[in-house]
Amino acid sequence: MSKSIEKMISHLKNQGFVFQGSEIYGGLANSWDYGPLGCEVKNKLKKVWWDFFVKKNPLNVGLDSSIILNSKVWKASGHIDGFNDPLIDCKNCKSRWRADKLIEEFDSSINTGIMTSAQLEDYINQNNILCKKCQKKDFTQIRQFALMFKTNQGVLEDDSSIVYLRPETAQGIFINFKNVQRSMRKKLPFGIGQIGKSFRNEITPGNFIFRTREFEQMELEFFFDPSDQKDWFKYWLDQIELFLTKKICLDKSNYKIRENLKDELSHYALKTSDIEFNFPFGWGELWGISHRSDFDLKVHQNLSKEDLTVLKEENNQKVLANVIEPSVGVERLMLAIFWQAYTEEQLEENNSRTVLKLPYNLAPYQVAITPLSKQLNQNAHQLFLELLKDFDAVYDETGNIGKRYRRQDAIGTPFVITYDFQTLEDQKVTIRYRDTMKQERILISQLKDFLNSQFN
């Protein structure tokens, strides 16, 4: 059966994973809330990332920096002066577009990142690119639109009180580099990981949770001596692949690694690679890894006048660390996981089922317990309470057994345990596998060992 992103979105809404933001007031463009099951997946995904990149890696430590920072941070990083999108308006229908995206959709081989506003305008005019909405060619001149959300701190609303919602989590790490290095007695190389909200006032967000104005990032800034001979870029790229394939079970056929060309690189980057995923709307960036040189520490050292170097004990020389940055959006990674997991299967006798084949470690519930008859409710519920001590379990006694199986398939529960009348005699329950629908009998006394073997 063919699947579509529209069907998947409807499924996720109906099953309690994702809801339209501010829905009772007509919604808010590209704003999403995560329901009871969605926030379980989200929290588990963040924990898996944190354990892999921070907690279980002896080189790295964690940080949780503020969303609102001193505006000088964004001046130093270049965001205030250069974090903009080129906008163009259609005079005929009043629609607003990103000029670079209009060109890229017209010809995907064009690298708009190196083009000036004048060059973007010339290309649109020379190639007769039309408004996507009304199919007319009557555009305004391009103007640069700031992507940072601006607000005021305190009771006065003047230039001195202007602050911004952070557009990335990275800068909070850079300005705390010396605090972390000193307090944790770290020597190069070491990394600082962070998970947190970021905000970008983008004009054309879309494709469900792929690109939103409010999003969550999982970023690692890895600091190393520029004279270090180890290829840390390759090391962290390999770690990303290991995480994707072994920790969250992404199929290798669904993603590819693309190294950015020199003219695609950001001004601070020596090297960048994108891990791209085959989303329902085509290939798109899933995860980025960049060699940021010493740009970040250097600009903050220059503006703050604070010494951000590290003293090398072997030669008593100061060094300004270089940085490798693996960065991924939580929601974008969730979209990739949902799209791979969402499956519509045709069964025998014209039956079908919709199943979320989520990785076991990301499923909202690991196991469901259900009684075959109302007479067994008390026994089954007691088993549920016992399993709840060690597993993410759910109890389900509504509807017939077939409907319960389909309901658990739809939300990705790997195993359903059925307590039946035979259980009273042999102390065995029926356990059903989500992906294969295979069933087998197992002793209640062996249930925990069985489940632990599946999840570990």
Curated annotation (Swiss-Prot):
GO terms for cellular component: cytoplasm. CDD domains: GlyRS-like_core. It is found in: Cytoplasm. The keyword ATP-binding applies. InterPro entries: aa-tRNA-synt_IIb, aa-tRNA-synth_II, aa-tRNA-synth_II/BPL/LPL, Anticodon-bd, Anticodon-bd_dom_sf, Gly-tRNA_synthase/POLG2, Gly_tRNA_ligase_bac, GlyRS-like_core. PROSITE patterns: AA_TRNA_LIGASE_II (PS50862). It comes from the Bacteria. It catalyses: tRNA(Gly) + glycine + ATP = glycyl-tRNA(Gly) + AMP + diphosphate. Substrate binds at R98, E168, F215, E216, Q217, M218, E219, E325, P326, S327, V328, G329. Its main location: cytoplasm. It is an enzyme of class 6 (ligase). One of its GO terms (molecular function) is ATP binding. Keywords: Aminoacyl-tRNA synthetase, ATP-binding, Cytoplasm, Ligase, Nucleotide-binding, Protein biosynthesis. GO terms for biological process: glycyl-tRNA aminoacylation. Belongs to the class-II aminoacyl-tRNA synthetase family. NCBIfam families: glyS_dimeric, PRK04173.1. This is Glycine--tRNA ligase. The gene is glyQS.
